């Protein structure tokens, strides 16, 4: 008898929740609150807690402390409470359960004190800073004939801002019979965390944009370095869930309107508003699009080509000067002037012709040269090169000589023609 009395305290707590049934648990209303002793299914990432003899599943935007044992969110009853240490598997949850096989282990009923997390929303009571934008009182969804412009994606949910209120795409709806029309349904978002993230610029390059963009912007969360979990999109009762967890999980409360919450996760990376580093980009472009010009190599190459051209022209000019010298010194016309011997014989002995002496006084004075200065092309540039004065003076002398010879030949030919016409 004494042994039986000692066993009573052990039996009574175990069956203390036996008054609850599956039907009574499912009939309980949803509650937006903070639960302790929370555990997570390792496969589905759903979060569960026992409360008042029932098993509750966290849906929508879930915000937890650093150790993830205390979470704030919208809690939905999905069945009877799971006995300790049986986890969220199919055996514990049954047809109304919240998890796939063997997912996770429930902590003891009286766990340690939660470690404060690094969240903007307080996971202990769901409070948030005053003054943030709130959803209008009207909870009715809007139906659109086509996908609206300037929407944005976050955690696989599609959102838009409409007159200061956020709405989330929750699927298509058909109306009418003849014809049947399909509409895109956008349900108002009631998540405080989602509004906080949107209006405080925690969505990188997505909170404010304009234009006519058909494709949604893909947002990246840029809040604090996060110890926060990332809840599954449209989190419901899990893969093993029956009518209790499944139906509540996919609706607008379970994941449609609240499934894309900001504080529920994201990469946690980045800081600030994504300032563009123009100087860094300019240096990168400079390094990629320019090259370090070898000034010495460019000058050497240009000088080599100019020297080659000057040598060729110098050889030709030397030959021409030799021919002209022979003609001027009375050695007879040679080279380029060999064909003019007969004409020269008619007017005298080369440059000593009396005809030239008579007209020498009428020839203009020779021009005076000025001091030479090197010709520099592209000064201060990588492709800079210069032409020295020795080559410039050579060109000037040859060019002047050619002008004189051309003038001489023109005058000579003119008077020769006059003499020939006179003799004929």
Curated annotation (Swiss-Prot):
Plays essential roles both in the penetration of the viral genome into the bacterial host via pilus retraction and in the extrusion process. During the initial step of infection, G3P mediates adsorption of the phage to its primary receptor, the tip of host F-pilus. Attachment of the phage causes pilus retraction bringing the viral particle into close proximity of the host cell inner membrane. Residues 86-105, 235-273 have a biased composition (Gly residues). Disulfide bonds join 25-54, 64-71, 206-219. Keywords: Capsid protein, Disulfide bond, Host membrane, Host-virus interaction, Membrane, Signal, Transmembrane, Transmembrane helix, Viral attachment to host adhesion receptor, Viral attachment to host cell, Viral attachment to host cell pilus, Viral attachment to host entry receptor, Viral extrusion, Viral penetration into host cytoplasm, Viral penetration into host cytoplasm via pilus retraction, Viral release from host cell, Virion, Virus entry into host cell. Belongs to the inovirus G3P protein family. It is a single-pass type I membrane protein. Residues 142-228 are annotated as: N2. It is found in: Virion; Host membrane. This is Attachment protein G3P. GO terms for cellular component: host cell membrane; membrane; viral capsid. Residues 275-424 are annotated as: CT. Residues 19-85 are annotated as: N1. Its main location: virion. The lineage of its organism: Viruses, Monodnaviria, Loebvirae, Hofneiviricota, Faserviricetes.
């Amino acid at each position: 008898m004494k042994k039986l009395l000692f066993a009573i305290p052990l039996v009574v707590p175990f069956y203390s929740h036996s008054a609850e049934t599956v039907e009574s648990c499912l009939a309980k209303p949803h509650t937006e609150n903070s639960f302790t002793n929370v555990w997570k299914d390792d496969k589905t990432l759903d979060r569960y807690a026992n409360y008042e003899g029932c098993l509750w599943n966290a849906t929508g935007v879930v915000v937890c402390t650093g150790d993830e044992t205390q979470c704030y969110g919208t809690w939905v009853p999905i069945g009877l409470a799971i006995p300790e240490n049986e986890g969220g598997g199919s055996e514990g949850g049954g047809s109304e359960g919240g998890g796939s096989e063997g997912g996770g282990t429930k902590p003891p009923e009286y766990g340690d004190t939660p470690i404060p997390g690094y969240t903007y929303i307080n996971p202990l009571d769901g409070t948030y800073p005053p003054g943030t934008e709130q959803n209008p009182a009207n909870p009715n969804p809007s139906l659109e004939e086509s996908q609206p412009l300037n929407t944005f994606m976050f955690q696989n949910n599609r959102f838009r801002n409409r007159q200061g209120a956020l709405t989330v795409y929750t699927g298509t709806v058909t109306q009418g019979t003849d014809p049947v029309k399909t509409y895109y349904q956008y349900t108002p978002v009631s998540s405080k965390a989602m509004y906080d993230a949107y209006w405080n610029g925690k969505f990188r390059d997505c909170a404010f944009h304009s234009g006519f963009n058909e494709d949604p912007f893909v947002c990246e969360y840029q809040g604090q370095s996060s110890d926060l979990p990332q809840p599954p999109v449209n989190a419901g009762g899990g893969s093993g869930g029956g009518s209790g967890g499944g139906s509540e999980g996919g609706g607008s409360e379970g994941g449609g309107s609240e499934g894309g919450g900001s504080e529920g996760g994201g990469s946690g990376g980045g800081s600030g508003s994504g300032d563009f580093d123009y100087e860094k980009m300019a240096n990168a472009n400079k390094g990629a699009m320019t090259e370090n010009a070898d000034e010495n190599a460019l000058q050497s190459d240009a000088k080599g080509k100019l020297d080659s051209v000057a040598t060729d022209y110098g050889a030709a000019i030397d030959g021409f000067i030799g021919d002209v010298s022979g003609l001027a010194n009375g050695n007879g016309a040679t080279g380029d002037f060999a064909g003019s011997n007969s004409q020269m014989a008619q007017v005298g002995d080369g440059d000593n012709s009396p005809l030239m002496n008579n007209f020498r006084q009428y020839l203009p004075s020779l021009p005076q040269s000025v001091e030479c200065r090197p010709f520099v092309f592209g000064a201060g540039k990588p492709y800079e090169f210069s032409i020295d004065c020795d080559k410039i003076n050579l060109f000037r002398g040859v060019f002047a000589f050619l002008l004189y010879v051309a003038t001489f030949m023109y005058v000579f030919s003119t008077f020769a023609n006059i003499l020939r016409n006179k003799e004929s």
